[in-house]
């Protein structure tokens, strides 16, 4: 794998940027960050975080993790609420990785090989620009409420077209790795 230079600077970029947006995720953000930091990878990554003016302890928890992982965690802690769309967009603009993974602050990964598996797939299948995986919806006690939901007419496994992506963007949003179009 090669690591390339970000077009906007002379700094060497990481291989994958993980975008995490938060708003009042105090109960969940530790599990979210731990699930990223547990990844067993042989490439560099960064965590680009955008906290949208949380009124609970989310920002303080993010600062705590950033102090322990200053070379990985790059937070923006807003003093004014801008909404999820702008928050996530601004995070995308800060990404330096060849690939971008997306994880909301109240979600978490359970497989420590998740990023490696998806990156290996994309690196070895150059005709693909994104990949996703199954997910489960859990309650506050991590009890599974619902296994992966695909919806009527949505293929469970297989190749997705741009029409699938546009129609089922939520599923792809919470469980994907995509090649960066920003670099």
What is each residue range found by the language model?
Residues 13-17, 46:
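Cell-envelope/extracellular polymer assembly enzymes that use nucleotide-activated donors
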Residues 18, 93, 133, 147, ...:
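Conserved nucleotide-sugar donor-binding catalytic segment
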Residues 25-38:
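Short, well-formed alpha-helical segments that are part of the catalytic scaffolds
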Residues 28-30, 56-64, 86:
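Acidic helix N-cap motif at the loop->helix transition within catalytic regions
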Residues 51-60, 80, 104:
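A conserved acidic beta->alpha catalytic loop
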Residues 78-95, 117:
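Glycine-rich, basic loop-to-helix element that forms the pyrophosphate-binding segment
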Residues 100:
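Short aromatic/hydrophobic "clamp" motif used to bind/position activated sugar donors
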Residues 113-147:
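Conserved donor NDP-sugar-binding/catalytic core segment of glycosyltransferases
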């Amino acid at each position: 794998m090669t690591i390339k230079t970000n077009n906007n600077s002379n700094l060497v970029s990481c291989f994958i940027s993980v975008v995490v947006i938060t708003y009042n995720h105090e109960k969940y953000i530790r599990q979210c960050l731990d699930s990223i930091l547990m990844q067993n990878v042989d490439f560099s990554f960064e965590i680009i975080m955008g906290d949208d003016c949380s009124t609970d302890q989310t920002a303080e928890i993010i600062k705590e993790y950033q102090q322990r992982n200053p070379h990985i965690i790059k937070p923006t802690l807003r003093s004014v609420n801008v909404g999820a769309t702008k928050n996530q967009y601004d995070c995308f603009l800060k990404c330096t990785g060849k690939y971008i993974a997306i994880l909301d602050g109240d979600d978490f990964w359970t497989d420590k090989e998740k990023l490696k598996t998806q990156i290996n797939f994309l690196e070895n299948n150059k005709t693909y620009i994104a990949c996703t995986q199954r997910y489960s919806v859990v309650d506050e006690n991590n009890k599974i409420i619902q296994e992966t939901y695909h919806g009527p007419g949505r293929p469970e496994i297989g190749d997705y077209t741009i029409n699938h992506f546009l129609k089922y963007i939520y599923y792809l949003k919470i469980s994907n790795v995509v090649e960066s179009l920003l670099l």
